[in-house]
Amino acid sequence: MVSTMEPAHHDRVLAIVSHLPHLLAFTICGTADDLEGESRQEVLQFAATGFRDFTRIAASDPVMWRDIFLNNREALLEMLARFMEDAQAMARAVRWGDPAYIEDKIQRGRVIRRSLIELKQA
């Protein structure tokens, strides 16, 4: 299937479904790598399915992704800012013990994931 869209819209869509996930995967791997000695080894030893699945794309070509990030920086930074706001809101909910907010966000994530499966995108 071929879709057409305006270039700016394309950049925003790809920023959220491709570029931001790669940036997050590279970053969480970097965070794990920066842990001190024993903790770093334990991260590798005890990495559960979620960490392995989430970070699979961190094995991608660093030069290619550097160029993608820099050539699409405006859309990527816009989506990163939105993500950071959402992550901060989730952090506040965890800190303040807001189970309704946390559950709502998890539920919304499940809906998106199930939609991908139904569309045979997963």
Question: Where would I find each of the regions flagged by the language model?
Answer:
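Internal alpha-helical scaffold of NAD(P)-dependent oxidoreductase catalytic cores
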Residues: M1-R56
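Interdomain hinge/lid region at the active-site interface
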Residues: S39-R108
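Long, positively charged, glycine-interspersed low-complexity recognition regions
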Residues: V111-A122
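A short hydrophobic/aromatic micro-motif that marks alpha-helical segments and, especially, helix-coil
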Residues: L24, A87-A89, I112-R114
